[in-house]
Amino acid sequence: MNIYIQQIHSLCLQNKYTNWYVKIIENAINRQEIIGYSETHHILPKCFRLGGDHDLENLVDLTAKEHFICHMLLVKMVGDNQMKSKLAYANWQMTMRSNGRDRYKICAQQYEFLRKQLSKF
């Protein structure tokens, strides 16, 4: 098993969101390749400050949808409020404009969730 997935298991809450996150990451690691557009994701987020920022084993290529979902899941995987705020902010930034157009379109429910998370901090 990937060492960064092991760290996720030991650092994060043991809940369905962590299980879903790990499953997405494991599927991406085992996938041959993504046809078309992909985004590189840190399995163990940089904001955890536990290293691995430049380790290729901590990087995985995800589809845009998988990447956005993983960032939504990360917010629900941690109990520490400071870490939760960093992850919520990173997720919020993914919805911001990039090159003059929306990077991701989110539904009202996702918008409400992110705004509530950010308002707590």
What are the residue ranges of the model-derived segments?
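Histidine-centered nuclease catalytic patch
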Residues: 28-62
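Core of folded catalytic or high-affinity ligand/protein-binding domains
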Residues: 71-74, 92, 100, 107
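N-terminal accessory alpha/beta regions
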Residues: 79-99
